Amino acid sequence: MTFSVKSPILGFEHIKTMELIELDKFFVKLQSKDDETSFTMINPFALRSYEFDIPSYYEELMDIRDTSQLRIYNIIVVSLPLEKSTVNFVAPIVCNMDNMTLSQVVLDVGAYPQYGQAEPIENFIQK
């Protein structure tokens, strides 16, 4: 699935088109169509309860009309063992399946203090 980037991933403002590749039921790969950049992402709902309001700026930018058509992912920094990998819950990637657009939505940390920028996956694994 190819997406047009409406609000860039921080530090990668040059990327305008990306492909979303499902790896399994938890992980996806976001691959730039402009260069060799790629990100491994996770379905946050597989780890925890995860809710936030999408600011109206992004709703307008991505022409969001039906939130049921959104897919939410979070970028992870992969480490070995996998449990040591960290998840960025502060800046989710929002994909609008209606019009194949995506944006990185940077959340207000004051409004969402429960979400961290580098939370280890092991914190969410039941022992």
From Swiss-Prot:
Is Chaperone found in the keyword set? Answer: yes
Q: What are its GO biological-process terms?
A: bacterial-type flagellum assembly; regulation of translation
List UniProt keywords, sorted A-Z. Answer: Bacterial flagellum biogenesis, Chaperone, Cytoplasm, Translation regulation
Q: Which GO terms describe its cellular component?
A: cytoplasm
Compartments in which it is found:
Cytoplasm
Name the job this protein performs: Acts as an anti-CsrA protein, binds CsrA and prevents it from repressing translation of its target genes, one of which is flagellin. Binds to flagellin and participates in the assembly of the flagellum.
Enumerate the PANTHER family for this protein: FLAGELLAR ASSEMBLY FACTOR FLIW (PTHR39190:SF1)
Family membership noted in the UniProt record: Belongs to the FliW family.
Q: What's the protein here called?
A: Flagellar assembly factor FliW
Q: List the source organism.
A: Campylobacter curvus (strain 525.92)
